[in-house]
Design a protein with these regions (language model features):
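Helix-to-loop junction immediately C-terminal to a conserved catalytic motif
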Residues: 64
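The feature captures the beta-strand-to-loop junction immediately N-terminal to the Walker
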Residues: 49-51
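ABC ATPase NBD coupling module
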Residues: 68, 80-100, 105, 124-128, ...
């Protein structure tokens, strides 16, 4: 049996973690987001999906702190972060992995990770310990001296996620994790998402690869014309006739 449509109101007495309520964004005379509300709990994998131009990128950029909204609120474990820049949101526990490569291409894998650790751990001994842990956990120890520009798509994503974890996030925004990677790398990314979930990190994903995304999420939000039109488990949302009409099509199946 599939779960019903879910809203923040259903969980009002629970710790909803990343809680986005009533976002509104206007570009000139065009309303890009209207009453946009979503939530992500700890250890939950959630996707934001919809047609091109539906408002996914706008919403994601606002949540990440790259753009300001014209209304609404963003809270992280009860703390208001709506006005904080991206780096302050990172320190508060909200990590962000953009679609574009976020690693320093001219540096080695080891130096890429250590650059983030230096911002968060003062003790050289503790930094070295954490560096070795991250290299081992993401199976990139053998790549420690490799330049980032020589990495494959899957290897690059592992390094980027290891870098992200160096700042100890509670929640992570994943922008197009399946874009531009081969089938083997897709399997690796699925495994990485499972690992993050096992660490009780909440994850919000947006991606054009709908099928692969829905295979790994606990819940999905569907946005169209700047509004959330449906949310729930993958099985629930893909069987909604309105979602099929505006986004998935009649023949879509997982």
């Amino acid at each position: 049996m599939t779960k019903p449509y879910l809203t923040v109101d259903n969980l009002i007495n629970e710790d909803v973690g990343l809680n986005v309520q009533g976002l509104r964004k206007v570009y000139k005379s065009r309303l890009a987001l209207m009453d946009f509300s979503i939530f992500v709990t700890k250890g939950e994998v959630v996707s934001l999906l919809g047609p091109n131009g539906a408002g996914k990128t706008t919403a994601f950029n606002i949540i990440a702190g790259m753009h300001r909204s014209d209304g609404g609120s963003i809270k992280l474990d009860g703390n208001e972060i709506s006005t904080l820049p991206t780096y302050r949101r990172s320190k508060a526990g909200l990590g962000y992995l953009p679609q574009e490569s976020s690693i320093f291409r001219g540096l080695t894998v080891e130096k890429n990770i250590d650059a983030i650790l230096e911002l968060n751990i003062r003790s050289p001994k503790e930094r070295r310990k954490k560096l070795e842990e991250l290299l081992g956990e993401f199976a990139i120890t053998h790549l420690r001296n490799a330049k980032a520009l020589n990495l494959s798509g899957g290897e690059r994503r592992r390094v980027e996620i290891a870098r992200c974890l160096a700042s100890k996030p509670k929640y992570i925004l994943l922008d197009e994790p399946f874009a531009g990677v081969d089938p083997i790398a897709i399997d690796e990314i699925r495994e990485l998402v499972r690992e993050l979930k096992n660490r009780k990190i909440g994850i919000l994903i947006t991606d054009h690869n709908v099928r692969e995304t829905l295979k790994i999420v606990d819940r999905a939000y569907i946005i169209n014309d700047g509004k959330i039109i449906m949310s729930g488990t993958p099985d629930y949302v893909i069987n909604d006739q309105n979602v099929r009409r505006v986004y998935l099509g009649d023949k879509f199946a997982l």
